[in-house]
Amino acid sequence: MEWKEHITVDPNVCHGKACIRGTRVMVSVILDNLAAGVEPEEILRDYPSLTREAIRAAIAYAADLAGERVVPLWA
């Protein structure tokens, strides 16, 4: 999955947070919903500007970020 095709960061959109290209839906909103157990189909209903590919791109983006640094869990 090439998430760069679907995700953009623009300082003038959503305070510079990562968003799905062509929308104002932040990647964090998608990830928060998935983490809360919301099914992708429900996310697509709630945010009709999204696609399945956009949801997969958000997950791929998060996976790349997770590989970039270690977050100490003992702190």
Residue spans of the language-model regions?
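Long, charge-rich, low-complexity alpha-helical segments
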Residues: V25-A75
